[in-house]
């Protein structure tokens, strides 16, 4: 199984995912794909052997992955302070890979008793 973990910014979410995946699925091919060099470098510290950076790396590896994991923003154009390009978001969201999207603090700031309609 080929699992692509994608992250941007500092790559902390991706690194945590890769560390857990490496322990849980040692036979899986894990690929770290960052939107920037810092994110990729941090994810590579998890001990994976394959990593790539940038828009073309996202497009190329999205087509070949069985599973794509990362923060929710990887399927939203202009997310992560603009690091996710429309091309990246489309490549991740429209492929055949199963998606595992992790909600992050910026997407989970609602209090327990609030709903989205309370904010609108």
Task: Show where each model-derived region lies.
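A short helix->loop->beta-strand "cap" motif at the edges of active sites that frequently abuts
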Residues: 28, 94-99
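N-terminal/domain-start segments enriched in small and hydrophobic, helix-friendly residues
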Residues: 1-6, 117
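N-terminal beta-loop-helix "entrance" segment that forms/cooperates
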Residues: 31-52
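Glycine-rich phosphate/diphosphate-binding loop of Rossmann-like nucleotide-binding domains
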Residues: 4-34
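Mobile beta-alpha loop/short-helix "lid" or hinge segments that flank ligand
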Residues: 97-107
């Amino acid at each position: 199984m080929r699992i692509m973990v994608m992250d941007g910014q500092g790559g902390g979410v991706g690194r945590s995912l890769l560390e857990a995946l490496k322990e849980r699925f040692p036979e899986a091919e894990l690929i770290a794909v960052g939107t920037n060099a810092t994110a990729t470098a941090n994810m590579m510290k998890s001990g994976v052997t394959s990593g790539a950076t940038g828009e073309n790396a996202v497009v190329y590896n999205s087509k070949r992955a069985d599973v794509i994991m990362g923060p929710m923003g990887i399927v939203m154009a202009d997310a992560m302070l603009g690091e996710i390009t429309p091309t990246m978001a489309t490549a991740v969201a429209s492929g055949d890979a199963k998606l595992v999207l992790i909600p992050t603090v910026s997407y989970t700031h609602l209090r327990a008793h609030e709903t989205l309609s309370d904010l609108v």
